[in-house]
Each structure stands twice: as structure tokens, then as C-alpha cells.
């Protein structure tokens, strides 16, 4: 199992507003190797909020295929559009990991 986490720091009050954007569904569910998406709000003591958008894939190759797909482009096409409001996103970092052990 391969997990990709997008660690996103947003302005306070925006994590819960933004979370549904990542789990509204779309073409990603039909892609080979896709398992699920979870969005976590990370508890920290500072002025911003941290979200971890976690996607589970069968293999890293499956994830890489997603990033090169038309479905990926469609899912990300509106995020760079200019609006009258400034973006609530302060920073983001992608972390890739292979699951080595699990207890259910």
C-alpha cells in the first residue's frame, strides 16, 4: 500500500470549509489502484490550521499514473484561478510513504 499526504496549511477557519473539495468524488475512484481519500484537521497550537489530505493507492506507480491523467488535470484546473479573495492556502507539502505494517 502506498499513501500520499498533502500537508496543507490554511488560514484559521478554512480547514472545515475546504475539506469537502477533496472528497466530493469524481474520476479518481475509477482509477487503477485507488483505495480512498481522507482529510484530517491536525490539532496544533498556532494561528493557522493544518490539513492532511491522505490518498491510499495500491502502488506508487498507480499514484504516478493519477498525476499524469486527464482526471488529475480536471480535478486541479480551478485551483489557480484568480478571485477577488486571496487564497486561504498558506503552504503545502507532499509526503509519500509506503505502508510497512498494519494492525486492524
Curated annotation (Swiss-Prot):
Its main location: cytoplasm. Its EC number is 1.14.99.48. NCBIfam families: PRK13315.1. Keywords: Cytoplasm, Heme, Iron, Metal-binding, Monooxygenase, Oxidoreductase. One of its GO terms (biological process) is iron import into cell. It comes from the Bacteria. InterPro entries: ABM_dom, Dimeric_a/b-barrel, Heme-degrading_MO, IsdG. Belongs to the antibiotic biosynthesis monooxygenase family. Heme-degrading monooxygenase IsdG subfamily. Allows bacterial pathogens to use the host heme as an iron source. Catalyzes the oxidative degradation of the heme macrocyclic porphyrin ring to the oxo-bilirubin chromophore staphylobilin (a mixture of the linear tetrapyrroles 5-oxo-delta-bilirubin and 15-oxo-beta-bilirubin) in the presence of a suitable electron donor such as ascorbate or NADPH--cytochrome P450 reductase, with subsequent release of free iron. The record marks 66 as: Transition state stabilizer. Residues 2-94 form the ABM domain. PANTHER family: HEME OXYGENASE (STAPHYLOBILIN-PRODUCING) 1, SIGNAL TRANSDUCTION PROTEIN TRAP. This is Heme oxygenase (staphylobilin-producing).
Amino acid at each position: 500500500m502506498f499513501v500520499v499526504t498533502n500537508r496543507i496549511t490554511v488560514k484559521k477557519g478554512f480547514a472545515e470549509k475546504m475539506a469537502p473539495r477533496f472528497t466530493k468524488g469524481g474520476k479518481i475512484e475509477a482509477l487503477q489502484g485507488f483505495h480512498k481519500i481522507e482529510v484530517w484537521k491536525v490539532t496544533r497550537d498556532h494561528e493557522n490550521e493544518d490539513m492532511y489530505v491522505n490518498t491510499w493507492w495500491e502502488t506508487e506507480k498507480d499514484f504516478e499514473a493519477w498525476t499524469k491523467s486527464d482526471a488529475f488535470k480536471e480535478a486541479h484546473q480551478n485551483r489557480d484561478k484568480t478571485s477577488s479573495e486571496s487564497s486561504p492556502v498558506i503552504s503545502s507539502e507532499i509526503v509519500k510513504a509506503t505502508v510497512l505494517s498494519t494492525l486492524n
